[in-house]
Amino acid sequence: MKTARQITLDLLIRMDTQGAYSNIILDHAFTQNDADRRDKAFSAALFYGVLERRMTLDYLIRYYSGIEFDKIKTAVVEILRMGFYQLLFMNSVPDSAAVNESVALCDYCNSTKAKGYVNAILRTFLRNEKQIDYGNLTGEAKLSIEYSCPKWLVKKWNSELGEQRAMQMINSCFGRPPIYARVNTVRYAVDDVIGELESEGISAAKNSLIDACIELANTKGIEQSSAYKKGMFHIQDISSQICCKIAAPMFNETVVDLCSAPGGKTFTCAEIMNDRGRIYSYDLYDGKVSVIANTAKRLGLTIITAAENDATKFNPDIPKADRVICDVPCSGLGVIRRKPEIKWNRAEDNDLPKIQRQILDNASKYLKINGEIVYSTCTIEK
């Protein structure tokens, strides 16, 4: 069985080489490994911590390494990132363990020759009392390294929000966000679901703002729980649930959900409608459509039809709807805390406004008279 650090190293290498999604590969790794709850929690904290603080960690590697950064083996870079992160940000890990376990990882990833190199860098950092020398860096350049936020983003937020609000935004990118779920009220009562989850060691509490919304803790391996397999709930962020509350679909209405995957709004709307009416749930990719269909089946929701569709192109086969939901593609800057890799994968978004407008224009054509559109996006860009 792999150790928590070995699991983390594998995940970070995948992020670096394959451009994977952090939440998806972490969940998959935990279903493939029989690590206990404590090890999974440690691995998740280290994994997300390294992703969040990557710019700071890479600055330290460059500062202490005698080898050019681009010439260091990917696995060794990740080992050093993990080592520096534990030394700086994980007070529960003794310094000696952070160094020794990092050195041991070199054997695990067939980089035995790098053991002395890793050991020397981390121990030199310790001898310097873990101080970060920012040299001549000032202003936005220093903030960028200190808070591990790309300089273009620091500059953008300073310009658009002002320095005080920008600092609040930068700080808000750290730490793991709460995990929320929506109870499948078509089949189960909220209190019964909470009881079932807690009997399996998963903490659950009602949210006071949204009916049937529960906040979860100790969720590692939740997809293996009997509550999950019974279709008692689906994971959905509270902001997404708020969109459904605003949409307020009614019994026997028709709802069209464009850009639907992974389907949270579709499922919640079906539950609000008590599984009475019709929901047409669309996505561009067949694989994502399958995810929607399979989850609807797990939840026992019968009014959902999932299908492929390009939301930027008008489709005359889509029926007229009472509500159309548009969760349009965006830069994702509003969900950095949930997906920290967004900071490092800056996409060219010059076409996004055009794409968003095309989707919105088409959505209006699917509406019945007096129908309503709910338009949402997970960015904060102007």
Language model features: what each stretch is:
Residues 1-382:
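S-adenosylmethionine
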